[in-house]
Amino acid sequence: MLAKPAAQFTLEEAQAEVEKLRKQLNQWRLEYYTKDAPTVTDNVYDDHYRDLQALEEAYPKLVTPDSPTQEVGDVINSDFAKVQHPIPMLSMGDVFSFEELSEWDARMQSNVGHPVDYNVELKIDGLALSLIYENGKLVQGSTRGDGNVGEDVTRNVLTIASVPKQLKQPLSLEVRGECYMPKAAFAKLNARQETEGGTPFANPRNAAAGSLRQLDAKVTAARELDTFIYTLIEPEQFNVTTQHEAIAFMQALGFTTNPSSEVAGDMQAIDTYIKKYTTDRDALPYGIDGIVLKVNDLALQAQLGNTVKVPRWEIAYKFPPEEAETVIHDIVWTVGRTGVVTPTAVMDPVQLAGTTVARATLHNADMIRDKDIRIGDTVMLHKAGDIIPEVSRVLVAKRPADTPPAPIPEVCPSCGQKLVHLDDEVALRCINPMCPAQVQEQLTHFASRNAMNIDGLGPKIVAQLQAKHLVKDVADLYHLTAADLAKLDKFKEKSINNLLSAINNSRQNSVERLIFGLGIRHVGGKAARILAEHFGDLDHLMTASQEAIADVPNIGPTIGEAIVTYFKAATVQKLITQLREADVNLRYTGPTKPVVKDSFVAGKTVVITGKFAEFSRPALTKQLEGLGAKVTGSVSKKTDILIAGDAAGSKLAKAQSLNVPIMNETELLANLKD
């Protein structure tokens, strides 16, 4: 909040504050729109945004075209082809109280000279999506981007079950809506992220954005995205005259529309709608962060038009964050499998958004410092994305005068080794590979179903094995005897035999399970399989260069660096030797793709860009891989052929600069026929 009303700032003070706010907001916009990794909640962003608006209104000469108040979305910065929106995808104005909403309605009625009917809709917490159909067939899906230029995500959109690939009528049209991740899918994804050593997503909106913008469509397909469609572009060509009719029309074509929209003719009906969904939002299977009012009459919408940034005929009412007050009694630091040390607040139990909350993640030391969170503080909690408990703010007025700052550990709470920051990481990390807490997590992960699949070796058994000094790393599992297991609590002959059998059977697993089970940073189950199939055995992977690993399709430099760093460690090399001596299989024994030696792309690295008349991108990728090609997502000096369709974008320019051979669709068809 501003230190004083905007009108009381001098011009010099206002200019300094405006520059400060713009810098902060632009950083947060970059994190939200481009990186899909916000570091502040929506309400914190909104508060700063409104401060900037107030100062610009008080001093119009300070308004510039590049101010966050004048722009939609963020600068496009990705490997996706660019899409020009013929009709801009604008943002929405918003209000934060029913009083402000009523004032907006009063201005609307005054402007048009008569009462106005609104179509009232839920504000889905996702990201805006445009879908274009030609003769009933989906030809393009794109993100909002900066409002004028978005990203072509057609290949990923094709994996979303609720998006019709063929309409029920052969119409050519554009619709827009929201791509979101259901709450259940979000919970499943974050559980998988943690299992695979990845970073959990902050909320479903960012999970949806990150999933839709994957270079590998198979990743998108696995993440269970969904859509609600709510805008019909150029509705007059279909004789649709109201927003409510447009939703029914789109539903009849096969689109998924939200069933909760309704027409309201007065603010009392709108107030009832708001109260209903303020109460019911937790029970919905998807996240909402407000409601939207749209002038129902489409001709009146056209008459009202738009500002440079927002339509004049719609407004979003954003729910205030549901909060609960509690007291922090402790901050507990725990060590994860990859060594990240994470703080958790232990609090008085409190009811929040339908559940009892007694713990909340504090994410990292920087958050504790930035929010000045202390043990004994009274704090307000909210649920990020209606799911993850977080501390909104500290009620400093209730803090006892002698409360010291929360201590930030300098050494690992498990092993006592000094904690470090790696690269540009915010997280504190223990890099001791023998850290007991990490070893326990690593052993549990190693035995998990998607890794070595050692049935019966869960966290409680692992903890007992450690406590009795029977295992110190995963190789020790293969030297356990019946006599060792007999020392465990409540472990009888049947349990002993079953666990020994499961351990013995795991020796024969194909090596991708071992690679995943080792818990290498950034290496999930899919990456492990790709690497195992590509290199054939663990020895070739261990001796491969970072560049050779990075060039494997769908792997890249981050995983390449992580693998080389991991296998350089003397402790890891010793561990692999021990696994080899324990007769653990180190070769890939899974299915392999047939290699076609006489095709024009056999053994070559191919990049596909642009749109094609005869192919969808997924179908073309599959066909080329069947001919022996390695299809990758980005152009480099290792690329052998760029296959370029229409609207090829930056990949074409990069290929030209690197003198990479370029093949158009006509040439491609000719080669496929040969």
From Swiss-Prot:
Cofactor(s) required for function per UniProt: Mg(2+); Mn(2+)
Entry-linked InterPro entries: BRCT_dom (IPR001357), BRCT_dom_sf (IPR036420), DisA/LigA_HHH (IPR041663), DNA_ligase (IPR001679), DNA_ligase_AS (IPR018239), DNA_ligase_CS (IPR033136), DNAligase_adenylation (IPR013839), DNAligase_N (IPR013840)
Residues the record lists as binding Zn(2+): 412, 415, 430, 435
Entry GO CC: cytosol
Keywords: DNA damage, DNA repair, DNA replication, Ligase, Magnesium, Manganese, Metal-binding, NAD, Zinc
Top-level taxon: Bacteria
SUPFAM superfamilies per the UniProt record, alphabetical: BRCT domain, DNA ligase/mRNA capping enzyme, catalytic domain, Nucleic acid-binding proteins, RuvA domain 2-like
CDD domains: BRCT_DNA_ligase_like, LIGANc
Pfam families: BRCT, DNA_ligase_aden, DNA_ligase_OB, DNA_ligase_ZBD, HHH_2
Catalyzed chemical reaction(s): NAD(+) + (deoxyribonucleotide)n-3'-hydroxyl + 5'-phospho-(deoxyribonucleotide)m = (deoxyribonucleotide)n+m + AMP + beta-nicotinamide D-nucleotide
Binding annotation for NAD(+): 42-46, 91-92, 121, 144, 178, 294, 318
Function: DNA ligase that catalyzes the formation of phosphodiester linkages between 5'-phosphoryl and 3'-hydroxyl groups in double-stranded DNA using NAD as a coenzyme and as the energy source for the reaction. It is essential for DNA replication and repair of damaged DNA.
Family membership noted in the UniProt record: Belongs to the NAD-dependent DNA ligase family. LigA subfamily.
Protein name according to UniProt: DNA ligase
UniProt organism field: Lacticaseibacillus paracasei (strain ATCC 334 / BCRC 17002 / CCUG 31169 / CIP 107868 / KCTC 3260 / NRRL B-441)
